[in-house]
Design a protein with these regions (language model features):
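N-terminal membrane-proximal hinge/A-helix region immediately C-terminal to the signal-anchor transmembrane segment
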Residues: 2-119, 126, 130, 152-160, ...
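C-terminal helix/juxtamembrane-tail motif
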Residues: 2-3, 262, 482-496
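Conserved cytochrome P450 K-helix E-x-x-R motif and the immediately C-terminal K′/meander segment
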Residues: 47-70, 342-384, 394, 404
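Classical protein tyrosine phosphatase
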Residues: 84-86, 92-94, 192-197, 201-203, ...
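Cytochrome P450 heme-thiolate monooxygenase catalytic core
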Residues: 103-115, 146-309, 327
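Cytochrome P450 heme-thiolate "Cys pocket" and heme-binding signature region
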Residues: 137, 297, 302, 421-451, ...
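Cytochrome P450 heme-binding "Cys pocket" and the immediately downstream C-terminal segment
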Residues: 322-324, 444-482
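Conserved cytochrome P450 K-helix/beta-meander segment immediately N-terminal to the heme-binding cysteine loop
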Residues: 395-422
């Protein structure tokens, strides 16, 4: 009898929760008169992502393609209303013109329960602004130039380790190889550690890199779209093992990159040859050890996954388009002959390579969606929508980059899209691989250089062809937030 009563109470409670969820929480856009995509309980419009059917980039790409004529439309991420911006002028409004009302990403950040979440990418409001001012001088072209020799050495080691494979005209899996190269680069530039992942693919540095990006779509969805849930239940997004690893090995204390040490000791970064203007009054607000560790952590996250996936996609496309591969190789040869060796200026003068990397990020944007949250209520210009504080905003970058109205024949790999005249003819917010506005990626220069050096190191010595095991087109892994290929990318490598 008691069991029957408990079951009855459970069913009634579940029914009440369902009704409240569906007819109250998921009724927001209908009440506001905004066109919306019909949601389901309990994930809203994220069901296909949290169940592993689509990547988050594909989910919002598909919604954009279907509903872009509405300019803006409503969706639900779990119980939260989410306004998707499909109009380029409105995207500029959110990212730049009305930045004061949309300055936060709305993703999980709680330094008390997860100290390593207190980094530049996630921090809100004033904390973000103060840290951005401190960190901006660490990513000037002058500072990247100072790091160039480290990057070059990693690239040379990278190419050298593939010599035997090339001589045998063997098949290589480039997704893993570029991940190991990226690990070596980040560990060298951020921590002063020679990780040797190219020689030792299963060492502890590669192990922890894999662990950070292990597949967990449900938690990724909470991080991006429902941070309040993680906050309420005190769920740290960063695996505690990663924190313990840093503490046990004293990586931050003894091997931390020099620029962050300056921020800890002085509160500002010393000026380089670009005559950076530093706010020396900030010396009273030096970075703490935990704050510095958080910045090192995001440096690894941002530099590792985005650059390695971009390089992977790029070489995949070049293996299919031998004419483009040959044209890049010709440019590399010309620049090396002109400069005598690989230099910072030589890489920057490789204009065709730059177009190829840009086209790669157009077709495969590393971060396929941009998130913002409304921090100050406002009327969205040229619409009848009043955006209330706390409303999540999503910009479907992957959808924009594959829109045939913006990029004709969007599935075609065509570096000429980034000729100066083509760029000038497009809306400036039609290409967003690094975001835009005040919260544009601070490490854009570093990301470009890391990717280009990896490609130059390989293409100057080797040729690449597609292996029959690699599908055309590629399919995407459903779990990661970054647009990642599913399975391996197998290419045949041979000497020039």
């Amino acid at each position: 009898m008691l069991l029957a009563e408990l079951i009855g109470i459970f069913i009634i409670t579940l029914s009440v929760v369902y009704i409240y969820y569906k007819y109250v929480l998921l009724n927001y856009w209908r009440k506001k008169g905004v066109f919306y995509v019909e949601p389901t309980v309990p994930a809203g419009n994220l069901t296909s992502y949290v169940t592993g059917k689509l990547s988050v980039g594909e989910l919002f790409r598909d919604a954009y393609m279907k509903y872009k004529d509405h300019r803006v439309f409503g969706m639900y991420t779990f119980f939260k209303p989410n306004l998707v911006i499909a109009d380029l002028d409105l995207i500029r409004t959110v990212l730049t013109k009305e930045f004061a009302s949309f300055h936060d990403r709305g993703m999980f950040c709680n330094e008390k329960i997860d100290p390593l979440s207190g980094h530049l990418f996630l921090l809100p409001g004033k904390k973000w602004r103060n840290l951005r001012v401190k960190l901006t001088p660490t990513f000037t072209s002058g500072k990247i130039k100072q790091m160039f020799m480290i990057l070059k050495e990693c690239g040379e080691e990278f190419a050298k380790n593939l010599e035997n494979k090339a001589q045998m005209r063997d098949c290589i899996e480039i997704k893993d190889i570029f991940a190991r190269y990226s690990t070596d680069i980040i560990m060298s530039t951020a921590f002063g550690i020679k990780s040797n992942c190219m020689k030792e693919p299963n060492n502890e540095f590669r192990h922890w890199g894999k662990k950070i990006f292990e597949e967990r779509p449900f938690w990724n969805a909470l991080l991006m779209f429902a941070p309040q849930v993680m906050d309420f239940f005190s769920i740290p997004f960063t695996d505690r093992d990663n924190v313990e690893y840093r503490q046990t090995h004293n990586i931050v204390r003894h091997d931390f990159m020099n620029l962050l040490i300056q921020l800890m000791e002085k509160g500002y970064v010393e000026a380089d040859d670009e005559k950076d203007v530093n706010d020396e009054s900030s010396t009273v607000n030096k970075l703490t050890m935990l704050e510095a560790a958080a910045q090192a952590y995001v440096f690894f996250l941002a530099g590792f996954e985005t650059s390695s996936t971009t390089a992977t996609y790029c070489l995949y496309e070049l293996a299919q388009h031998q004419d483009i591969q040959d044209k890049i190789r010709q440019e590399i040869d010309e620049m090396l002959k002109q400069h005598g060796k690989l230099t910072y200026n030589a890489v920057n003068e490789m204009t065709y390579l730059h177009k190829v990397v840009n086209e790669t990020m157009r077709k495969y944007p590393p971060v396929p969606v941009l998130n913002r949250v409304c921090t100050k209520e406002l009327d969205l210009p040229t619409t009848n929508i009043r955006v209330t504080e706390g409303t999540l905003i999503t910009i479907p970058v992957f959808g924009l980059h594959r829109d045939p109205a913006i990029y004709p024949h969007p599935d075609k790999f065509d570096p000429e899209r980034f000729n100066a005249d083509k760029i000038a003819a497009r809306h400036p917010y039609a290409y967003l691989p690094f975001g835009e506005g005040p919260r544009i990626c601070i490490g854009t220069r570093f990301g470009y250089m890391q990717t280009k050096i990896g490609l130059v190191s390989l293409l100057s010595k080797y040729k690449f062809k597609l292996h029959p095991r690699t599908p055309i087109p590629l399919t995407f892994d459903e779990a990661p937030i970054v647009l990642t290929v599913k399975g391996g990318v197998h290419l045949i490598i041979e000497p020039r």
